[in-house]
């Protein structure tokens, strides 16, 4: 049984020290597509965290019974089944958000973070640690998504979660929204800025030259 310190490290490590987007550069495509609004960024975070945590748990529970030759197929089947469940739940209880997320919920099946943790961690680690690792990596992914979504929605549309924060000139206010921030390429610059900030604070994350 893992001790509390080890569980805490597995849970909190991916948020900054080993962030899947900022350090490992995984899951960037969805980060570009779903961060124009905080609402979609939050729902995508919850969806990916649930899929990663539960797929890690189930794969870890049967890891000793999966033949090496078909392990990827088994992992994909478990992940795909969980994604279908998540997608159906979203369509049932948050249909408007599900429409905005479009195909990106389905693409969780091929998300490098989910597949990477299943293969590199869950196949070698007991269920509880694997479950916590899934939650930690989901939270790390979400930390970047929500940070980018905060900047893009606030300064691109003057709102957060659809609630007006900065009064727009077009409605008699003072703020002129920056439309560039609502375009997907802006997320590249924001993610790059976050990576730069994190690696300035933690220089040990900078890759060695040569």
Curated annotation (Swiss-Prot):
Any GO BP: sodium ion transport
Subcellular localization: Cell inner membrane
GO molecular function: oxidoreductase activity, acting on NAD(P)H, quinone or similar compound as acceptor
Keyword field contains Protein biosynthesis: no
Origin: domain of life: Bacteria
Membrane topology type: Multi-pass membrane protein
Catalyzed chemical reaction(s): a ubiquinone + n Na(+)(in) + NADH + H(+) = a ubiquinol + n Na(+)(out) + NAD(+)
Broad EC category: translocase
GO CC terms, sorted: plasma membrane
Entry keyword set: Cell inner membrane, Cell membrane, Ion transport, Membrane, NAD, Sodium, Sodium transport, Translocase, Transmembrane, Transmembrane helix, Transport, Ubiquinone
Pfam family, one: Rnf-Nqr
TM helices/strands, residue ranges: 14-34, 42-62, 72-92, 103-123, 131-151, 178-198
Entry EC number(s): 7.2.1.1
The keyword Repeat is annotated on this UniProt entry: no
Known function: NQR complex catalyzes the reduction of ubiquinone-1 to ubiquinol by two successive reactions, coupled with the transport of Na(+) ions from the cytoplasm to the periplasm. NqrA to NqrE are probably involved in the second step, the conversion of ubisemiquinone to ubiquinol.
Family according to the record: Belongs to the NqrDE/RnfAE family.
Subunit structure, interactors included: Composed of six subunits; NqrA, NqrB, NqrC, NqrD, NqrE and NqrF.
Name of the protein described by the UniProt record: Na(+)-translocating NADH-quinone reductase subunit D
Lineage: Bacteria, Pseudomonadati, Pseudomonadota, Gammaproteobacteria, Alteromonadales
